[in-house]
Regions:
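Extracellular/periplasmic catalytic domains that process cell-envelope and extracellular macromolecules
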Residues: 51-55, 82-83, 117-119, 144-148, ...
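Serine-dependent carboxylesterase/thioesterase catalytic core
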Residues: 63, 105-198, 214
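Secretory targeting and sorting signals
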Residues: 1-21
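Active-site catalytic motif of lipid deacylating hydrolases and related acyltransferases
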Residues: 24-36, 47-122, 295-303, 307-314, ...
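Surface-exposed patches in mature extracellular/periplasmic domains of secreted proteins
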Residues: 92-95, 121-125, 273-282
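C-terminal catalytic-base region of ester-bond hydrolases, centering on the histidine
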Residues: 200-338
């Protein structure tokens, strides 16, 4: 949401109000090129039969933090949509979504574009938890995707952050990157909701539970999941507004609750968002949504919980930096993160075949906890750890551009690029310092 600040300036006896410029990119600025390699983006999307030249809007399923699309949706939404003849695709994020949600946004952008191109029509999006806010990130910073989306249905989405994340990261530092970004005071949340929360031409249905133990506050229409303004058609509805006795919690509202599924189907079957009055009482007498097998439910739900609790990512002592493309001052089309970016350097002489060893440096008192290495645009290494000091990269191409991205324990992100010239004879190994 755009904030207008009136500043009182007394100069020559004149009271002059001024409007502070927003630090975030305007909503109509074209999005940057995707930084994630195309091969990884393609591999992240799994689709049902019928997606090509679809007869009706296909649904993009976006999972919550800690699980893949298969782990969350294979036992509920996937079979339920298939039973209704609705094609779908599920997108999965690196590290099960525990890492930087800005990167996850690129996966959703690719999924939207791919599904729109294959189906030949506008798509719908259903997301649970993080899966509710990351699609909004894609729509906010890649404007071309807005014309490709008809409906956005979110379940327990922390659209304005969660005080649970505030408390968790405040008590048990360090936290995973996505946890820091889910705090109500995070830069990610501020950027997500900058200028406007919705966009014209898209229908938004946000479903939440008052008994959600993870995403709060969520007691009424002013809670974190609810959206307001911006031009999109919006329905914000608590599960308990439809079924007062439904006490579903965070996982359930997005994976097996009948009210949430009924809201999704209502939004898909009608113009505009879901209308709670059309849902009737049928969801209130059902124990599970369609697609859930009551016999295997205990095992299916337990497997999802196990996957969620066992998923891990690096941990930081604070929120990582925002991507440059989110800021008003960034050059249009730039996708780099705000942080230290070293200029491109060229290794002197030539390097013989073998392994390049890179020494990773950071500020005194800090340490590198994550590193990614790209060779000619293709990611060849992704490593996390408590203290990373060196990495090794195979140098097979005669000439290569190597880009190294590190993230420190304190959330500082650095990027350096080095061009390496190969030769038939020469040093089989070289040491290149990463500034």
């Amino acid at each position: 949401m755009r904030r207008l600040l009136l500043t009182t300036i007394l100069a020559l006896g004149i009271l002059a109000p001024t409007v502070a410029a927003s630090p975030f990119a305007p909503v109509d600025r074209p999005g940057p090129a995707l930084d994630v390699p195309a091969q990884q983006l393609a591999a992240s999307l799994q689709c049902s039969p019928g997606i090509d030249h679809a007869m009706r809007a296909p649904v993009l399923l976006v999972p919550g933090t800690g699980v893949t699309a298969y782990q969350e949706f294979s036992w509920n939404y996937e079979p339920a949509l298939t039973q209704r003849g609705i094609p779908w695709c599920g997108v999965s994020f690196p590290d099960s979504g525990n890492d930087d949600m800005q990167i996850n946004g690129e996966y959703v952008v690719n999924a939207i574009r791919t599904m729109h191109a294959r189906s030949g029509r506008r798509i719908a999006i259903y997301g649970h938890s993080q899966g509710g806010e990351v699609p909004r990130w894609a729509l906010r910073f890649w404007p071309d995707t807005r014309a490709m989306v008809d409906d956005v249905v979110g379940a327990a989405g922390p659209n304005h952050g969660s005080i649970v994340a505030n408390a968790a990261c405040g008590i048990r530092k360090p936290c995973q990157p996505s946890d820091w970004q889910t705090a109500t005071t995070s830069h990610f949340i501020a950027a997500l909701n900058s200028y406007q929360e919705t966009f014209p031409g898209i229908s938004y249905t946000e479903v939440y539970s008052r008994f959600d133990e993870e995403v709060q506050p969520n007691q009424n229409d002013t809670g974190t999941s609810s959206l307001h303004g911006g031009g999109g058609q919006i329905t914000n509805v608590a599960v308990q507004d439809v079924c007062p006795n439904d006490v579903v919690e965070h996982l359930g509202v997005g994976s097996y609750d009948p009210v949430t599924f009924a809201a999704l189907v209502d939004a898909l079957d009608h113009d505009g968002p879901a209308v709670p009055a059309r849902l009737g009482l049928n969801p209130c007498i059902q124990r599970f949504m369609p697609g859930v097998n009551p016999v295997t439910f205990p095992t299916d739900a337990a497997n999802t919980v196990t996957a969620l609790e066992s998923s891990q990512s690096m941990e930081l002592n604070g929120e990582g930096p925002l991507a440059c493309y989110t800021t008003a001052s960034c050059a249009a089309g730039s996708g780099r993160l705000t942080g230290s970016v070293a200029p491109t350097s060229v290794t002197s002489g030539c390097v013989g075949p073998g392994t390049l060893r890179f020494v990773l440096h950071t500020e005194r008192g800090d340490r590198v906890v994550r590193v990614e290495v790209y060779v000619d645009g293709r990611r060849v290494l992704h490593r996390t750890g408590r203290r990373l000091s060196k990495v090794r990269v195979s140098a097979r191409a005669p000439n290569a551009t190597i880009r190294i991205v590190t993230v420190s324990r304190h959330g500082t992100r650095r990027t350096s690029t080095r061009r390496v010239k190969g030769c038939r004879k020469g040093r089989p190994k070289t040491l290149v310092e990463h500034p």
